[in-house]
Amino acid sequence: MYTATDVVVLSSSPDQIPSLTLAKPKCDAEKAFVLSPVSSSPSALPSASELFQPPTRSRFFKTGDGNEGSSRTAREESETGTKQNDLAASRRKRAARGGRQKRTKEQPTNESQTLFDHPEPPIPKHVGCTSKKGTGSKKKRTDAANKCTKSENKTITGKVTKPGITETTKSEDKTKELVTADVSTGKSPANKLELEKDGLQLEVAMKRRLDWTPTKDTGKQAVALDDTGDNKTRFGELLSEYGFLKAATDSQGDSKLSDGAPTKRRRLELVDTRTPSTSKRTSPDADSDRSNVRSTRSSKAPAAEGKPKKRSRKITTLTGRVTALYTNDCTDHLDAANTMISPSDDVSSKLFSKSLDIDSCVLPPEDAVDYLKDQDLIFGTCSQLEREDSPTMLRDMQKAIRASENSMIENRKPSSTTRAGSGLYSHTAVSRFQTPRDLWSVAARDMDGSLAEIEVLDMVDITDISELPPKPNGELPDRSEKNDKDTVSQGESFRPVEITDEVEVEVDVRTENLATSETNPGETACGASELRPRPRFADWKDSDLLKQVRLYGFKPMKSRRKMIEVLERCWKAQHVSTRTGVQDVPGKPDDGSAGKAGTIKSQTNKQASKMDAAEKTRKASACLKEEAKSSTALEDKPSHAADGSSQVLTKSSFADVEEIEDSEDEVIPSPSRLQSRYKRHISESRSSQPLSVSATPSTPSSPTRTNADSGTKPSPFGLAAESRLPDLASQITKAVRLQPRSFSVDCKRPSWHEKILMYDPIILEDFATWLNIEGLGLVHEDREVSAEFVRQWCESNGICCGFRKNSRQSER
């Protein structure tokens, strides 16, 4: 069998030489896709040792078709005759020649395909021609292929690969240009014709390998290429889904919105009724989605058109009520525009119209403040809710409230406050009741909770004590019925003077500082010489008026009329107080009418005494100083001590401290009562129980607390209390209260009582010196006190005191 095989190979060996030479033009650079050119030198002829190698030949074709090899062996063994051997030999020779011719044509194509797709070794076209192959010819072809590829072809090792794997392993090739060229050959018709011309017939090879390869539909490759192109377009459609779609946004926003307060978001359907914008998607799924959205919006449109009618019944908060004046107009404009705008209109036109409407609501700062003043607001907690029947219900309610208030004011009797504000003080700025709606008149209410009718009394016009205030149901006399100021008598009153507020404060302060008792005989004697007929200030010159105004302690005024009115008023007050001679009797009335009369009397007396002392005290200051040291001054000076509590460093006055002391009459009597008690019962006061001095005007305390402190805490002056002489501590208290006030306007030297009231630190040495020289002499006390005794008295009364720094190391 080896002999027969050797003969066949030797006879066919010369035919392999031309096949190597014919492969040269087929493996040029153009068809090898930029591969290195094939060497032009012919390869050497194979040696005899290479040709006669049966194991190599059988090992090389071991991966071939085993079925054909076995059938060929069976046919050779079955042949027994020489004739059959000759026929078989001739048939194999012809098949070998035909196979060599086919291989010479298909060899370049198979080699190029091996470079691209890495397939198995070339397979002949016909079935019968695969049995006879020479080992020498196979070696020569392998050497020629290695020279052409220059070690780039790594798959000519007899390894068989599947056709499906060849498609998936294209991206793993090192030469990307070859892969892209192979993919492009499936699309271009020129490459297809070239492949058919070269004779690459893969269908036959696939059929031959059905024995060991599973059945696979090869037609899916073309479909896969088409699907790849479709996937590219579908991937772009998937990306388009991530774009902004107005229709989808509107549908999502519509499902989240609901009816609420004006400050919440509204439905977009009420504003935007246009058709959704066209999308760039072309797939049927996108078209169906868009049609579904359009149908959904069209179905919701009829239901949404009837919903704005429920706005009048919705629940609003305080913020919504306040902002309703601005939001209602804008929303009404949008509702009216919604019915007129067609669905094809652009959104920009609506936004432009809405912006114009909002801009029209903005006002300048001045107009905004004026509009805010006229705005009606209802205040309440944020949790308080109210249902409104119409947008104008709030304004109608405010109008009804105002109408009811006006009707109540017209029906009720006019109060004296209104009359005083309209007729009595309409042309003056001096009066404290310049306007009827001050704080106290607004806040004053009776037991039923209604506004109380406050009576305003003109203390300047009340010239006689017999003139009582009118009854509540009566009316004040008309000011127009009074005579002119030129023809009025001395007993009649004058109209109030128009003076600025600064002058009013100066009048009150100066008259309080310069006021003295009307029962002083020394002042009466000095002032009696000054009585004369009322001068005509209208005939005076401006310079004389200024001098006279300065005498009364007022600043110069620019208006001549104001100066004349001030001078006439001051002169009238002096002479009226001198003629009437009203005494100030403290006490509390039993009934309401008596209380009003007593209040009017006290106010009248104070006003008269203040205006009377304005001129007399300045002209008779010399006689006042002389009488201050005499016994007559002891009867007159209690009024100064009573008024001393109202003396302050500033020009404004404050509440009278003596009024606070009156509530403790049983514990701490007023200075006037102490003086009168001491004068009337001097013998009884020496033997009486000493008064408690634990409470002072600066820190008033209740009688219960005073008695408790005096009972539980032993007094440091217990030894002095046992004697028949009055307690020295009580004498110091009386002396402090009886010290005359300083008459300086600026109060640079306040009295000791004033220093105690203002919590000024008391220097013990100075205070003791004053008591020994002047203070104790006011109460007819001949004893002297030391600084240490004064310190004990100050500490017992809670007065801030201390020694001088140079005289004592410690200061309290």
UniProtKB/Swiss-Prot annotation:
<feature type="compositionally biased region" description="Low complexity">
    <location>
        <begin position="690"/>
        <end position="706"/>
    </location>
</feature>
<keyword id="KW-0227">DNA damage</keyword>
<dbReference type="GO" id="GO:0006260">
    <property type="term" value="P:DNA replication"/>
</dbReference>
<keyword id="KW-0233">DNA recombination</keyword>
<comment type="subunit">
    <text>Forms a heterodimer with slx1.</text>
</comment>
<keyword id="KW-0597">Phosphoprotein</keyword>
<feature type="compositionally biased region" description="Polar residues">
    <location>
        <begin position="644"/>
        <end position="653"/>
    </location>
</feature>
<feature type="region of interest" description="Disordered">
    <location>
        <begin position="575"/>
        <end position="719"/>
    </location>
</feature>
<feature type="region of interest" description="Disordered">
    <location>
        <begin position="249"/>
        <end position="312"/>
    </location>
</feature>
<dbReference type="Pfam" id="PF09494">
    <property type="entry name" value="Slx4"/>
</dbReference>
<dbReference type="GO" id="GO:0017108">
    <property type="term" value="F:5'-flap endonuclease activity"/>
</dbReference>
<dbReference type="InterPro" id="IPR018574">
    <property type="entry name" value="Structure-sp_endonuc_su_Slx4"/>
</dbReference>
<keyword id="KW-0539">Nucleus</keyword>
<comment type="function">
    <text>Regulatory subunit of the slx1-slx4 structure-specific endonuclease that resolves DNA secondary structures generated during DNA repair and recombination. Has endonuclease activity towards branched DNA substrates, introducing single-strand cuts in duplex DNA close to junctions with ss-DNA.</text>
</comment>
<keyword id="KW-0234">DNA repair</keyword>
<feature type="compositionally biased region" description="Basic and acidic residues">
    <location>
        <begin position="169"/>
        <end position="179"/>
    </location>
</feature>
<feature type="compositionally biased region" description="Low complexity">
    <location>
        <begin position="36"/>
        <end position="49"/>
    </location>
</feature>
<feature type="compositionally biased region" description="Acidic residues">
    <location>
        <begin position="656"/>
        <end position="667"/>
    </location>
</feature>
<feature type="compositionally biased region" description="Basic and acidic residues">
    <location>
        <begin position="476"/>
        <end position="487"/>
    </location>
</feature>
<feature type="compositionally biased region" description="Basic residues">
    <location>
        <begin position="90"/>
        <end position="103"/>
    </location>
</feature>
<comment type="similarity">
    <text>Belongs to the SLX4 family.</text>
</comment>
<feature type="compositionally biased region" description="Basic and acidic residues">
    <location>
        <begin position="612"/>
        <end position="640"/>
    </location>
</feature>
<dbReference type="InterPro" id="IPR027784">
    <property type="entry name" value="Slx4_ascomycetes"/>
</dbReference>
<feature type="compositionally biased region" description="Basic and acidic residues">
    <location>
        <begin position="282"/>
        <end position="292"/>
    </location>
</feature>
<feature type="region of interest" description="Disordered">
    <location>
        <begin position="212"/>
        <end position="231"/>
    </location>
</feature>
<dbReference type="GO" id="GO:0006310">
    <property type="term" value="P:DNA recombination"/>
</dbReference>
<dbReference type="GO" id="GO:0006281">
    <property type="term" value="P:DNA repair"/>
</dbReference>
<feature type="region of interest" description="Disordered">
    <location>
        <begin position="36"/>
        <end position="194"/>
    </location>
</feature>
<protein>
    <recommendedName>
        <fullName>Structure-specific endonuclease subunit slx4</fullName>
    </recommendedName>
</protein>
<dbReference type="GO" id="GO:0033557">
    <property type="term" value="C:Slx1-Slx4 complex"/>
</dbReference>
<feature type="region of interest" description="Disordered">
    <location>
        <begin position="465"/>
        <end position="494"/>
    </location>
</feature>
